[in-house]
Amino acid sequence: AAYESDESWGPEYDGTPYLPWYAFDEKYLPQHYLKPVPWQAPKNDVDKLYRTGVNLSNSVSVSRAVGGTNLRFSLGNNEVTGIIPNTKLEKTNLSISFNSTLSKKLKSEGGFNYIITSRENPENSYTMKNPISKVLYAWTQRQLDLQKLQDYYKAPDGTHRTWNRKSADDGTPRYADNPYWTLYENTSNDKRHRFFGNIGFTYNFTDNLYWVGKIYGDIYALNTEARVAVGSKETASYVVTNYTNSDFNYETRLHYTPKLGKDFTLTGFIGLARREGRYQWVQGKTNGGLVLPDFYNLENSVETPSSSNYRS
């Protein structure tokens, strides 16, 4: 067999018997061991991988006026199940806004938001470590049955089973992992905490002269994890990265709007603005593989783990 081939060139489905990729596991798949199957179109083609995505949203909000202050509080949650198995996004948003008359001349308004966003397996694209589109549409063979790929992607002892094996005696992947191995074993996830908002004050000296001061802030902390399981085409690894970012804007303005007659008003202002921003990330990753399978920790690195960082 030409095990180096990881693509199809359109051979006719003529029913010729051949040994499929799952016909070499005597221990765990004795019912298929060395049993040929006809060369034919798969019963479960690439559409078997996909499912209907589901988006569940719910929210509650409360508004109240107390004296000269108007308050609004809202809490929302959004959960999205992706069209590819084992992919998910969840977002929770807490929001508070207000406006208040503090005196005859002084007013204040603002709003604050706190958002927690979690994602599971967000990076399944044309890459070496997440070859979903690559395996299904670029480098693959058209006779593959997706149900078989799903049912047999992992042996009971944890061994990776892929259609793209190196040889009859060597079941390790030559070029590509089983797509279901990627989805359930080579996983990634991230979680972000974000806080942003603004607060402002307006002071009226006269009917034509007033001052405005505002502060805008946006802060987030993002933690990401990426895993390559033992037995994958790529070297087993674990990478964890922490990102932090803060952005603040300050502005102050003095407005003057005199009336220069019955039908004519002049509008002008002077002001100052300042921006402060900070960004940094810290990353740690294993090297040379993982000592123990299914244990993702930097201390499980075969060689000394490495770290890097950046700050601006």
Spans of features found by a protein language model:
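Surface-exposed loop/interface segments of Gram-negative outer-membrane beta-barrel transport/assembly proteins
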Residues: A1-P42, T52, G82-T87, N93-R194, ...
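Outer-membrane beta-barrel initiation region
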Residues: K48-G53, S59-V66, K154
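Phosphate-interacting basic helix/loop segments used at nucleotide- and nucleic-acid interfaces
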Residues: N58, F195-F196
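Residue-level signature of outer-membrane beta-barrel architecture
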Residues: R64-V66, N77, I96, S100, ...
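Alpha-helical support elements that line or immediately flank enzyme active sites
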Residues: G197-Y203, G217
